[in-house]
């Protein structure tokens, strides 16, 4: 789903307006899922901005980040997608605060909640702070099978 979102949210005018799409994964196993996902798309992540953080003790701490270097021959910093991996749960207050913080007046936030069982996805959507929905936010909820085309599901929430 994240790669599909990256394809759909690509901005052809990035060079002039510097608009980026940020895709955030929120998962209690984000460290492992990040490694699987980044391993599958090594070349993309070598050229992309990304960061990894953990949500614990009611705060979100960014521990790792990457800025592309050595790609001047390709036109410099040209990938218009940023990636974030948050090791935590959508039920954590600091994670909800981060989603709310990300919903600036100019931002268009789409939250896709993709848990293995659809009833858990719906419960997670209902659990989100109501202020998030007041900020030009769209939520999409679905249950996902445990495997998609033979690959593990890389999910919990994307924005």
Give the location of each predicted region.
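Cytosolic regulatory regions of ion transport systems
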Residues: 1-159
């Amino acid at each position: 789903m994240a790669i599909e979102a990256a394809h759909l949210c690509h901005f052809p005018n990035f060079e002039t307006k510097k608009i980026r799409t940020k895709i955030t994964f929120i998962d209690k196993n984000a460290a492992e899922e990040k490694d699987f996902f980044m391993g599958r798309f090594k070349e993309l992540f070598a050229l992309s901005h990304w960061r990894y953080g953990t949500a614990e003790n009611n705060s979100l701490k960014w521990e790792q980040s990457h800025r592309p270097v050595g790609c001047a021959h390709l036109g410099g910093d040209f990938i218009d997608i940023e990636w974030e991996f948050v090791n935590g749960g959508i039920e954590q207050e600091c994670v909800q605060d981060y989603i709310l913080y990300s919903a600036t007046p100019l931002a268009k936030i789409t939250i896709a909640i993709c848990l293995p069982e659809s009833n858990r996805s719906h419960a997670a959507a209902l659990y989100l702070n109501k202020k998030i929905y007041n900020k030009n936010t769209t939520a999409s909820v679905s249950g996902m099978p445990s495997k998609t085309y033979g690959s593990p599901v890389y999910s919990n929430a994307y924005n």
